[in-house]
Amino acid sequence: MTINLLGALATAFIICAVTGPSFISVLHKLNFGQSIRECGPKEHMKKSGTPTMGGIMMLLAILVAVAVWCNFTPALCIALLLTFGHALIGFIDDYIKVVMKRNLGLTAAQKFFLQFVLAGAYVYYIETHVQSDLSIAIPGTEYMLPLGWLYYVLVFLLLVGTTNAVNLTDGLDGLAASVTLPVTVAYAFIAYNTGHADLSVFALAITGACLGFLLFNHHPAKVFMGDTGSLAIGGGVAALALLTHTELLLVILGGIYVMEATSVIMQVTYFRLTGGRRIFRMTPIHHHFELGGWKETKIVKRFFAASCLLCIAGVLLWLNGNGGF
């Protein structure tokens, strides 16, 4: 099985590395360039026109890697559905913004509806394929907290929250992909040690795709993943949390995602309550550090290191609640 895990990692990486230059060239010819908001950091204006929708090559790499190195089990199929389903939402959003030149893309209501449909697909899966008591594990303990029908609400909140948090994290060159690396490695470990070798292969396929994509997305980025990529990654990570029954642990493993999303919520809430005052210079919080004088590369390195530490802590906590090795 070790060969399958390493094979998936290597295959996804190689596909991204090999197809990247040609794919970026095609995006250039199609004029699929990213438009930069004027309200963002001024340094980002020079990135205008950089090809976006690079998430498509990541998805191709993930699909091929999984198809070559793993059988399509029900759990793997639902993970792919949540990943590619959210990728489709992101692609539609990117297409509207980049091709149709409508900067707002899909409305929030349209996104929520499509995500609700995907959440419904997962609910159908657990009702038909899993004998679940609709409970969640408390990290670091063996206690399972029964939620009943509230578990279905959690599914929707986790999917919407994770996908949008990853989307918010994708605001600097290489940031979302870098932060995701330790998260998917951690989930590969957890999945493998809970008897979900298929999900472990899937997690490492995402890892390989992110590594390959970083060859072209590191600063200065030659391509952006777009909503196509960020929503797909969010869907994949959320699927891993749901299918390994580590919903609450994701708050720790994906702590950077949580921090990014929370900073936006805090900023908007405080702004409205105080009539225009702000807590941070700009959100998501990576822009706060950027406007404070930190270079993009410094922020990405610090956030990556923090993500690694959070994932180590999360895995140790998970081991404590599961009797160790």
Where are the regions a protein language model picked out?
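Alpha-helical transmembrane segments
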Residues: M1-H28, M58-L88, Y122-T128, G148-F325
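A cross-family signal for N-terminal binding/gating loops and helix N-caps
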Residues: H28-G33, P41, M45, M57
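Juxtamembrane helix-capping/reentrant segments at transmembrane boundaries
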Residues: I36-T50, K101-L114, H286, L291
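Short aromatic-rich membrane-water interface segments that cap or initiate transmembrane helices
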Residues: S48, I138-L150
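Hydrophobic alpha-helical hairpins/lids featuring a short glycine-rich hinge
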Residues: F72-T107, K111-F112
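Membrane-interface helix termini and inter-helical loops of multi-pass transporters
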Residues: V99, V130-Y143, N322-F325
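Peri-membrane helix termini and adjoining interfacial loops of integral membrane proteins
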Residues: N31-I36, G90-D93, H129-I136, I279-T283
